[in-house]
Amino acid sequence: MQHLVLIGFMGSGKSSLAQELGLALKLEVLDTDMIISERVGLSVRGIFEELGEDNFRMFEKNLIDELKTLKTPHIISTGGGIVMHENLKGLGTTFYLKMDFETLIKRLNQKEREKRPLLNNLTQAKELFEKRQALYEKNASFIIDARGGLNNSLKQVLQFIA
């Protein structure tokens, strides 16, 4: 078994699904944003504000290469922009948690939105969402309809890997 990699726009449920998959499959869960935050000593928002998005993307790219060297399979929850990296290919079996923009925004309360620097301006966020959709689909081994909630997404992933 390879890594199971969850991709999708911020707020699509990647972190929650990763935890459930980890329990169901008895695999360790890794969260790329959390790993980067812990290493740098700043929140994702803090990294964007103090070091810039380019540095965050460099940390992300380097982490992908590092994760490829792991010998055992993991569940990997990724940041929404990870699909911009060519080196994502070959990391594992990717599952795109697909959801429409309006549903994503409804799922995130104000506090959650404040943690996500790219959601400061909803018009720009929607443009980013639309640009990234093609990248998510291009990088996906499987597309998960995430509108049905966590349990439904979990069932879909488990069916694909059965």
UniProtKB/Swiss-Prot annotation:
ATP binds at residues 11-16, 116. Its EC number is 2.7.1.71. Mg(2+) binds at residue 15. Pathway: Metabolic intermediate biosynthesis; chorismate biosynthesis; chorismate from D-erythrose 4-phosphate and phosphoenolpyruvate: step 5/7. PROSITE patterns: SHIKIMATE_KINASE. Catalyzes the specific phosphorylation of the 3-hydroxyl group of shikimic acid using ATP as a cosubstrate. This is Shikimate kinase. It comes from Helicobacter pylori (strain J99 / ATCC 700824).
